């Protein structure tokens, strides 16, 4: 399957944007934006979790896929078997909505590819709100997952990530991963540009026989993923901020 996603998300916010406290020891200081009204966790009436990017990165570097990381870190969430699709994913038996920077990914086609829309390298943190909400339309009786992307900072920074995984069963069973990002800015403007690529090998059983692809759900075997993302932030004044997020995402499997 060949999938391409373009995401253009200009945000003009007329309210003060508090800084997300990535290393806050007290959850009361963490600000949640998924409810379209910036509030701390302590002020939220619904059960809320904020998963920091550092936790996600540790799980991904351990060889887990993104949706398996969510199942590990979010209480009550149930995901389907390994593959691109998140068909059947629910929170305590009810449907959920997936967003990137507040933009809803679930479409009327319900193609179950919402979690195959961003590389974990570009995730700052994830906000999870449990329970029904009407802010983003239908299909969110179980809650919502808002993926917040990394933004540029004033200090110049370069990030590089290399990784791999193999089962030592076959020359084609290894995964390869490389990602890089550069960011920087001034007191009034900042930006970040990143490229992340991952190649998935095949799966083999104990007899070194290849496991057959699940064509109905599009498994990750023999596929590659490319995520190119650019973000920019302009501080208009103390109370207004302009953000631009643009993304090219491609997830494609080989013909096996």
Q: What are these language model-derived features?
A:
Residues 27-61:
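N-terminal periplasmic "start-of-domain" segments of outer-membrane beta-barrel proteins
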Residues 33, 67-104, 124:
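Extracytoplasmic beta-strand/coil segments of soluble accessory domains associated
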Residues 35, 131, 161-167, 196-200, ...:
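Outer-membrane beta-barrel pore domains and translocons
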Residues 65, 113, 140-142, 163, ...:
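Transmembrane beta-barrel architecture of outer-membrane proteins
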Residues 103-130, 230:
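Short acidic/polar hinge/loop motifs at secondary-structure boundaries
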Residues 110, 164-168, 212-218, 255-256:
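Extracellular loop and loop/strand-boundary signature of outer-membrane beta-barrel proteins
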Residues 118-161:
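A beta-strand signature from Gram-negative outer-membrane beta-barrel systems
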Residues 171-201, 209-252:
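Transmembrane beta-barrel wall of Gram-negative outer-membrane proteins
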């Amino acid at each position: 399957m060949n999938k391409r996603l373009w995401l253009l998300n200009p945000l003009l916010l007329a309210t003060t944007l508090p800084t997300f406290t990535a290393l806050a020891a007290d959850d009361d200081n963490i600000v949640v934006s998924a409810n379209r009204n910036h509030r701390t966790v302590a002020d939220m009436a619904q059960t809320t979790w904020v998963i920091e990017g550092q936790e996600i990165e540790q799980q991904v570097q351990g060889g887990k896929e993104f949706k398996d990381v969510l199942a590990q870190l979010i209480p009550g969430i149930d995901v389907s078997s390994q593959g691109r699709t998140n068909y059947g994913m629910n929170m305590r038996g009810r449907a959920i909505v997936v967003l990137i920077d507040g933009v809803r990914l679930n479409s009327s086609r319900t193609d179950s590819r919402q979690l195959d829309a961003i590389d974990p390298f570009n995730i700052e943190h994830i906000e999870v709100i449990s329970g029904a909400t009407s802010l983003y339309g239908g299909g969110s009786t179980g809650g919502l997952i808002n993926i917040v992307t990394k933004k540029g900072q004033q200090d110049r920074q370069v990030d590089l990530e290399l990784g791999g995984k193999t089962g030592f069963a076959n020359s084609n069973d290894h995964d390869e991963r490389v990602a890089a990002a550069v960011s920087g800015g001034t007191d009034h403007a900042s930006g970040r540009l990143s490229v992340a690529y991952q190649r998935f090998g095949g799966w083999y059983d104990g007899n070194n026989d290849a496991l057959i692809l699940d064509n109905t759900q599009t498994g990750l075997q023999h596929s590659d993923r490319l995520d190119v993302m650019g973000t920019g932030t302009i501080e208009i004044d103390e109370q207004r901020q302009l953000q631009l997020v643009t993304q090219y995402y491609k997830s494609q499997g080989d013909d096996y």
